[in-house]
């Protein structure tokens, strides 16, 4: 029986291509059944898209939890139903463009844990349906504000009415919403004109595979090990006997973990392959949470 390909691909998504298009191309090129991305990028956006293949699809949520880094460009004086330049854009009349210092101060007010309303054209679920589907159907609905975390925002360029920022944020943050909210603060509106995701955690655009490279016959050689998806977790190295027990879902006591302050750990076998992600209980008992076969080739 042919061994299932397993691992991660870090891809530089081009503009005009959907995240699903990227997954479809990977799936076709590698001839795999299980394949999924770890965080949607809109067609307008470019940059880092992590695609999980094979058993690594079980780790999608861990990649989604990683910090995101973006570079976004915006234009004052416009509003849009999508909060970006690709929607139904309207010009705002009779407004004054803010000074750079005021824009910087306003951006700084977004740093921290804030309440943010997602765009109506987004993948947020509303009564079991995607918000963008309801918006396209012309349905009336309201989205509730959600708490998101913005760790850093820097105004890189300000050539009124255009401006560009660098942003470091947590999962669930909508960059379009930040631009919209800033435009509302100044009473002049703002839409996003370009967006690039420069990194997710340690996955950086400089290391990413291009759209064209996804057609190369040696694409499987570019798979990164599954353990990279949990690189932010503490690591526990175990011997072969222990790894076999964990692979079968057995709970094992590790006395040295009793006084640890973390709840989850990435468990590696002697060859540094990811065996599982395990939950640590207060007693030092380690309970496998997500198991990946220790003999999987590309883990």
Describe each model-derived feature in a short phrase.
Residues 1-171, 175-209:
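Catalytic cores of RNA-modifying enzymes
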Residues 1-14, 20-37, 41, 45, ...:
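Accessory RNA 3′-end/elbow-binding domains used by RNA modification enzymes
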């Amino acid at each position: 029986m042919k061994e299932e390909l397993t691992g991660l691909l870090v891809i530089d998504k081009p503009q005009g291509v959907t995240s699903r298009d990227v997954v479809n191309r990977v799936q076709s090129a590698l001839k795999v059944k299980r394949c999924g991305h770890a965080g949607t990028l809109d067609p307008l956006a470019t940059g880092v898209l992590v695609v999980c293949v094979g058993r690594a699809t079980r780790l999608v949520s861990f990649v989604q939890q990683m910090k995101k880094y973006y570079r976004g460009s915006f234009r004052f004086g416009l509003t849009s139903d999508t909060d970006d330049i690709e929607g139904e854009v309207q010009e705002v009349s009779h407004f004054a463009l803010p000074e750079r210092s005021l824009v910087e101060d306003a951006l700084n007010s977004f740093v921290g844990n804030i309440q943010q309303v997602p765009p109506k054209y987004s993948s947020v679920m509303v009564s079991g349906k995607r918000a963008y589907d309801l918006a396209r159907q012309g349905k009336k609905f309201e989205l509730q504000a959600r708490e998101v975390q913005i760790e850093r925002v820097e105004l890189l360029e300000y050539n009124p009415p255009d401006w560009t920022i660098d942003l470091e944020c947590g999962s669930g943050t909508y960059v379009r919403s930040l631009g919209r909210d800033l435009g509302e603060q100044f009473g002049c509106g703002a839409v996003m004109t370009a967006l690039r995701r420069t990194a997710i955690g340690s996955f950086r655009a400089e290391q990413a595979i291009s759209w064209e490279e996804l057609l190369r016959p040696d694409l499987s050689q570019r798979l990164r090990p599954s353990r990279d998806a949990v690189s932010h977790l503490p690591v526990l190295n175990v011997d072969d006997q222990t790894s076999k027990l964990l692979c079968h879902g057995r709970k094992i006591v590790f006395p040295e973990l009793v006084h640890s302050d973390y709840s989850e750990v990435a468990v590696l076998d002697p060859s540094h392959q990811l065996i599982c992600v395990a939950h640590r209980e207060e007693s030092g008992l380690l309970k496998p949470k997500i198991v990946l076969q220790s003999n999987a080739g590309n883990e």
